[in-house]
């Protein structure tokens, strides 16, 4: 599995692109699991580790009983605090004692690889607003730890994307940073006019209506090919 980095402003369709690609990929491979993580509101390592563990277990478990069993069986030194809501369709919430995590971060960072190897799966971890890790306490040390683990994973790939270009560029293109050349770097552009016109035609058709080409082109021009406003 290869690693991919995507950079573009908010509202340009990164998440939609990743979700669509994930859906198509899983339709072709029954052994593939996609884990989605959003770091928009994550401001420290403690929250990151809990969220990573929770999302990985959710993505690799078909029901909450399996999620609870995975949460217990794949940790040797950490004792996860498991919370189950009244709705069994919701994810199992996982938390740890922060002092234990600081002593044993490997167990969380290698969790996806362990599960993938044990269950014969391939896992892709998609992390939105990845540049937020640059705001953690001692970010370079944290990034070194992430890179040292993630680069060794054989059954897990990473799709890391974000909207703050200068911060993402600093993380991935600065040769002194741990994530330098971690994966294939992509810059997402605005959608070309013909594709947006086709999109308008399709959406109008879905509701039993139609739109002429000139009107569709005018809308594209007015929103400056911006995917969010085009919707």
Where are these regions (language model features)?
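Sensor-1/coupling segment of RecA-like P-loop NTPase cores
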Residues: 117-126, 132-138, 145-176
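The conserved phosphate-sensing helix
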Residues: 223-231
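P-loop NTPase nucleotide-binding core
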Residues: 2-4, 8, 12, 16-123, ...
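Conserved nucleotide-binding/hydrolysis micro-motifs of P-loop NTPases
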Residues: 11, 40-45, 130-132, 163-167, ...
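Surface-exposed cleft-lining segments at the edges of enzyme active sites
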Residues: 94-100, 131-134, 203-204
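Short, glycine/charged-enriched secondary-structure capping and boundary segments
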Residues: 21, 50-53, 139-142, 173-177, ...
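Helix-loop-helix "sensor" segment of P-loop NTPases
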Residues: 170-221
């Amino acid at each position: 599995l290869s690693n991919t980095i995507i950079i573009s402003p908010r509202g340009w369709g990164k998440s939609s692109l990743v979700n669509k690609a994930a859906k198509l990929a899983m339709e072709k491979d029954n052994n593939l699991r996609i884990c989605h993580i959003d770091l928009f509101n994550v401001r420290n390592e403690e929250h990151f580790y809990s969220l990573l563990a929770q999302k990985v277990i959710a993505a690799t478990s078909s029901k909450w009983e399996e999620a609870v069993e995975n949460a217990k069986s794949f940790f040797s030194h950490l004792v996860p605090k498991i919370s189950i809501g009244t709705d069994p369709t919701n994810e199992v919430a996982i938390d740890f004692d922060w002092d234990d995590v600081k002593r044993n971060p490997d167990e969380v960072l290698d969790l996806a690889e362990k599960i993938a190897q044990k269950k014969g799966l391939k896992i892709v971890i998609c992390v939105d607003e990845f540049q937020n890790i640059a705001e953690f306490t001692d970010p370079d040390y944290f990034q070194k730890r992430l890179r040292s683990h993630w680069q060794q994973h054989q059954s897990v790939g990473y799709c890391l994307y974000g909207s703050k270009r200068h911060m993402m560029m600093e993380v991935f293109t600065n040769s002194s940073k741990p994530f330098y050349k971690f994966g294939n770097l992509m810059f997402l552009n605005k959608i070309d006019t013909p594709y947006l016109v086709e999109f308008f035609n399709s959406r109008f058709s879905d509701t039993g209506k139609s739109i002429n080409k000139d009107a569709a082109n005018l809308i594209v021009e007015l929103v400056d090919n911006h995917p969010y406003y085009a919707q």
